[in-house]
């Protein structure tokens, strides 16, 4: 089996305001970890995507030793077509936009970082590219300089429009495909420590 310990996210979600939310996510973490433990022990081999994930696995499910099988990226698909359409003030964020870590990360970035960037660079543009944007994500399209695309046929053209890719995730583990894809496109990436933690020395 290829494993990801989603139970590790629950304590982060439990930081949400309100005692009910904390209770729900605390309970969910315990139940999910018990399920993950049963599944891991039912398989003869387990694989994780990074050394960070392996250490987490060892800590949470003692006695089961996973192997590391890193994520890959299709370098032919994620290949830059050149700079003809590149906006020197453009930034791009990619991901499924009803996934809570993506929603949290991009909302935090627009609230905490974007105003200062726009004040310094009035022509700055941010493209939030990905399917199923929540109402909260769609609302970011009302912020000056921000465009929420919804689903697109392919992300490489959007990488080619931008001067930088961002990955401001606060709830993240493993290796982020959005980071690998941007790197494959030869695009600089500004990532949070959480989004970069599975990349080792890259």
Give a label for each model feature:
Residues 2-7, 71-74, 151-153, 195-196:
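Short, acidic/turn-prone active-site loops that include or flank metal/cofactor-
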Residues 1-34, 96:
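Acceptor-binding helix/loop patch of EC 2.4 sugar-transfer enzymes
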Residues 193-202:
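Short acidic/histidine- and often glycine-rich active-site loop of Leloir-type glycosyltransferases
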Residues 1-2, 49, 69, 129, ...:
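Generic beta-sheet signal
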Residues 6-7, 25-80:
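Donor nucleotide-sugar binding/catalytic pocket of nucleotide-sugar-dependent glycosyltransferases
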Residues 19, 56-59, 67-161:
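Conserved catalytic-core segment of nucleotide-activated headgroup transferases in glycan assembly
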Residues 44, 160-174, 185-188:
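Acidic donor-binding loop of glycosyltransferase active sites
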Residues 178-181, 188-192:
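Short hydrophobic beta-strand element within catalytic cores of glycosyltransferases
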């Amino acid at each position: 089996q290829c494993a990801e310990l989603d139970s590790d996210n629950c304590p982060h979600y439990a930081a949400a305001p309100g005692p009910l939310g904390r209770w729900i996510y605390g309970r969910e973490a315990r139940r999910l970890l018990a399920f993950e433990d049963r599944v891991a022990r039912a398989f003869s081999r387990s694989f994780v995507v990074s050394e960070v994930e392996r250490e987490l696995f060892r800590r949470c499910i003692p006695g089961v030793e996973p192997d590391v099988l890193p994520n890959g990226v299709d370098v032919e698909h994620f290949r830059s077509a050149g700079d003809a359409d590149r906006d020197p003030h453009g930034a791009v964020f990619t991901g499924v936009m009803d996934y809570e870590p993506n929603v949290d990360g991009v909302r935090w970035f627009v609230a905490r970082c974007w105003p200062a960037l726009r004040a310094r660079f009035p022509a700055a543009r941010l493209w939030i590219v990905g399917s199923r944007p929540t109402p909260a994500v769609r609302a970011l399209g009302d912020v000056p300089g921000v465009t929420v695309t919804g689903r697109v046929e392919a992300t490489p053209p959007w990488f080619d429009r931008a001067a930088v890719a961002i990955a401001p995730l606060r709830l993240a583990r493993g290796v982020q495909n959005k980071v690998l894809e941007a790197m494959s496109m030869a695009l600089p990436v500004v990532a949070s420590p959480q989004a970069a933690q599975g990349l080792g020395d890259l």
